[in-house]
Amino acid sequence: MIAKEILAGLELFEGLPDDAQSAISAFSKELSFAAKTTIFSPEQSSKQIFLLMQGSIRLTIFASSLSEPVTVGVLKTPGQAFGFSSVVGQGYYNSSAEALTDVRVISVEGRSLMDYLDKEPAVGYTVMKRLAHVISRRLGVMRRLLLETIIDYERQASSIDEN
């Protein structure tokens, strides 16, 4: 169980009523991971949402045409959410998360959080709106990476002499 005062300082939960923070803290816990530890990967079922407390996390995705994973984000700011597939309807993680340094995170049980948010729609709206903002930022990064890849490909293709 995490102290509600800690949750109150995190982006997803700041400003929520005390009773909401108390309820969420009941199904939250602190975890630590050593540097180079894989926290989750795409083949794992998603049961938790994570919030960074200390350290750095690298988020990667795998593309079948590449030998190395593609980094889609590095999280360093306390409170940043990751691994939120369990609260957006997916049953699995769609990326990998690796600890770049020793890290401390808060793990929130996804099913318990969703059950609580369903019972408290005003709190649910606030949390999901904040989560949508996080997802929007991540999609912006992915869009930029995709455009850079397309531009690089087109530059290479246009420089090929067919004669």
Language-model regions: role of each:
Residues M1-N163:
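Cytosolic regulatory regions built on CNB/CRP/Popeye-like sensor folds
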